[in-house]
Amino acid sequence: THLSARVGLIAADDRAGSFYSNPSTAVLCKNRDSVWIFYFPEYGKDVHCGMKSEHLVGTSIPRFTFDTPTTPGNDFYKLCEGEHPLVMIFLPAFDHPVTREYLTRYLQTLPRLRGVRLACVVRSSPRMVAKATQGAEFPFTLICDAPGVLYGYLGVEQARGILSWSFTAQRIYKAAKEQGYRYNSNAPQQLPLTLVVGHMGKILFTHSGRSQTDLPEDCAAIREITREVVRTMAEDQRRAHPHCSDETLTLPDLVGWGDLDGSSN
């Protein structure tokens, strides 16, 4: 059984963290809450605990096992081995209003995710999520990290009060409050983190949210971000090897991502 396209608010237990960055280079796109920026340093560095976002691209997340609401002990590197790019979005607890809002958006727009795989990370236990969803399966991967191990490893921090707010966040909280949700507006809040990840956990792109809602607004936005990452990687490869034939396979071709590096919709 798959979830319906509306994720209900179950409780008000928000184990929050956040992540911020000093991104650089070219602007990718804009929406009402954010400006998306590419950062592509040289590849091959090892990642260390507590690294800032400007050092994440080109590093590899170590191999680990994770639990989903229905399946324990999944291999992260196996998840990375798929023939399509993997986008990871770090959210607050499953029952947090922002998490509920964006999971709902992703469920509603899932058909527009063609050629991309999605994994959302929530700071809730598998048991809590399974209870809230009555054991229903998500149509994309939901990684449960209640202790915040991944958040901590990637250097996730917190933003307080108005620094983490946006107009969209205000609307989300207003609607949640009308449904009985209570929160401390001055408490630390987690800011989202969006990654595009390749094989062996290599981080190809990172965007650290400047507000609670500075993340892809739906599956169409997720796909467009990933297409730009693939295009940029292919262009970088062509610049690095200018004497190669046009028939030489690009990195997206080699990993089966060619369907994103074109004009198809």
Description of each model-found segment:
Residues L79-Y106:
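Short active-site neighborhood of thiol/selenol oxidoreductases, capturing the structured segment around
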Residues D13-D14, N22, K30-D33, E42-D46:
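Intrinsically disordered, low-complexity polyampholyte segments enriched for Lys and acidic residues
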Residues R100-Y153:
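Structural microenvironment flanking redox-active thiols in thiol-disulfide oxidoreductases
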